[in-house]
UniProtKB/Swiss-Prot annotation:
It is found in: Secreted. One of its GO terms (cellular component) is extracellular region. This is Nicotinic acetylcholine receptor-binding protein Mnn-4. It comes from Micrurus nigrocinctus. Its main location: secreted. InterPro entries: Snake_toxin-like_sf (IPR045860). GO terms for molecular function: acetylcholine receptor inhibitor activity; ion channel regulator activity; toxin activity. Binds and may inhibit nicotinic acetylcholine receptors (nAChR). Belongs to the three-finger toxin family. Short-chain subfamily.
Length: 25
């Protein structure tokens, strides 16, 4: 899953987590 941080940077959502962590793609 991919999400966007406040800076619109693509971030990865680890499996089992609904919220985006600070994992840069």
């Amino acid at each position: 899953l991919k999400c966007y941080s406040s800076r619109t940077e693509t971030m990865t959502c680890p499996e089992g987590k609904d919220k985006c962590e600070k994992y840069a793609v």
